[in-house]
């Protein structure tokens, strides 16, 4: 099974070696017949504390680092 790769914006970099990434996706609502935006937050491992709030990053699924941290930062997206 391939690993998920997601792109989002860093919303928090307060914890050590951890960033919170907000990923936005769009889908067509079956009843409303409108395109709806949904945001979800993921905790990701940032080994060198390199990324700051507002950066756009790509994250990849990996083995769990902790209870809620199951993604790792791949690289910065432009």
From Swiss-Prot:
Gene3D superfamilies for this protein: Nucleic acid-binding proteins
InterPro entries documented for this protein: NA-bd_OB-fold, Ribosomal_uS17, Ribosomal_uS17_bact/chlr
Family matches, as SUPFAM superfamilies: Nucleic acid-binding proteins (SSF50249)
Name of one Pfam family that matches: Ribosomal_S17
Gene Ontology cellular component terms for the protein in this record: cytosolic small ribosomal subunit
Function: One of the primary rRNA binding proteins, it binds specifically to the 5'-end of 16S ribosomal RNA.
Family: Belongs to the universal ribosomal protein uS17 family.
Quaternary structure and partners: Part of the 30S ribosomal subunit.
Protein name: Small ribosomal subunit protein uS17
Lineage: Bacteria, Pseudomonadati, Pseudomonadota, Alphaproteobacteria, Candidatus Pelagibacterales
